[in-house]
């Protein structure tokens, strides 16, 4: 399933994120904020249980999360800021890291780092990466997690290309995709058009 998060606040901040005149500091802040906002949609079906708490004036019934263990796994390096935004809302989530880069010649992902919680196979995992372009990195990261025994995975990105969505759905049809926008296409270099450029470079001021 593909879920487009079209909340007005998300779309407002996404428009500013795309702007080529947005500098690294504001870009990081916007990505952080969009990721936090998108998490509400991603987690809206988490199980809850009813509890009672004592207020200064009496007893109130309420709901709390029902022991759903979560992990957030950013694809390095651009996914780091997204993970930070989500951790602000879910500070109890564990964090893993998967390092992948795209070979400029083949456009295939190359793995260079993986560090995951020991109990990752017992957790619902949210994989985050700002861009779903060719889909290669997302497919590779999710394959790594499944090899570790993870069964419940969601993928969250800011902008996606139709080609990347198709690739990910063909490889992992059980993984829901959350995105703030589906753009037109990929160019010959594997970049999303119109997109926002290279998210990692814009985040960290590199080229």
UniProtKB/Swiss-Prot annotation:
Q: What EC numbers are recorded for this enzyme?
A: 2.4.2.9
Domain of life, per the record?
Bacteria
Binding residues annotated for uracil, in chain numbering: 192, 197-199
Give the record's free-text account of how this protein's activity is regulated: Allosterically activated by GTP.
The processes (GO biological process) annotated in the record are: UMP salvage; uracil salvage
User: Pathway, according to UniProt?
Assistant: Pyrimidine metabolism; UMP biosynthesis via salvage pathway; UMP from uracil: step 1/1
* Keywords assigned by UniProt, alphabetized: Allosteric enzyme, Glycosyltransferase, GTP-binding, Magnesium, Nucleotide-binding, Transferase
Catalysed reactions, semicolon-separated: UMP + diphosphate = 5-phospho-alpha-D-ribose 1-diphosphate + uracil
Pfam families reported in the protein's UniProt record:
UPRTase
Q: Which cofactor does it need?
A: Mg(2+)
Q: Give the record's cofactor note, including how many are bound.
A: Binds 1 Mg(2+) ion per subunit. The magnesium is bound as Mg-PRPP.
Q: Enumerate the GO terms in the molecular function aspect.
A: GTP binding; magnesium ion binding; uracil phosphoribosyltransferase activity
Binding residue positions for 5-phospho-alpha-D-ribose 1-diphosphate = 77, 102, 129-137, 198
Question: What function does the entry list?
Answer: Catalyzes the conversion of uracil and 5-phospho-alpha-D-ribose 1-diphosphate (PRPP) to UMP and diphosphate.
Q: Please report which protein family the annotation says this sequence is part of.
A: Belongs to the UPRTase family.
The protein in question is named: Uracil phosphoribosyltransferase
- Taxonomic source organism: Dictyoglomus thermophilum (strain ATCC 35947 / DSM 3960 / H-6-12)
Gene for this chain: upp
């Amino acid at each position: 399933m593909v879920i487009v998060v079209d909340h007005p606040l998300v779309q407002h901040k996404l428009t500013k994120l795309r702007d080529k005149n947005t500098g690294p500091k504001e870009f990081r802040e916007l990505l952080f904020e969009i990721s936090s906002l998108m998490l509400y949609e991603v987690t809206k079906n988490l199980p809850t249980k009813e509890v009672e708490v004592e207020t200064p004036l009496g007893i109130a019934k309420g709901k709390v999360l029902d022991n759903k263990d979560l992990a957030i796994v950013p694809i390095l390096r651009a996914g780091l800021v997204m993970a930070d935004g989500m951790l602000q809302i879910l500070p109890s989530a564990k964090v893993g890291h998967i390092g992948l880069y795209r070979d400029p010649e083949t456009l295939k992902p190359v793995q260079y780092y993986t560090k995951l919680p020991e109990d990752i196979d017992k957790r619902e995992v949210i994989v985050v990466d700002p861009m779903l372009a060719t889909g290669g990195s997302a497919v590779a990261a999710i394959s790594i997690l499944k090899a570790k025994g993870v069964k419940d995975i969601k993928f969250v990105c800011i902008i996606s290309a139709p080609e990347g969505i198709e690739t990910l759905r063909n490889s992992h049809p059980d993984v829901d995709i959350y995105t703030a926008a589906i753009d037109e296409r990929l160019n010959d270099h594997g970049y999303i058009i119109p997109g926002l450029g290279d998210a990692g470079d814009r985040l960290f001021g590199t080229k």
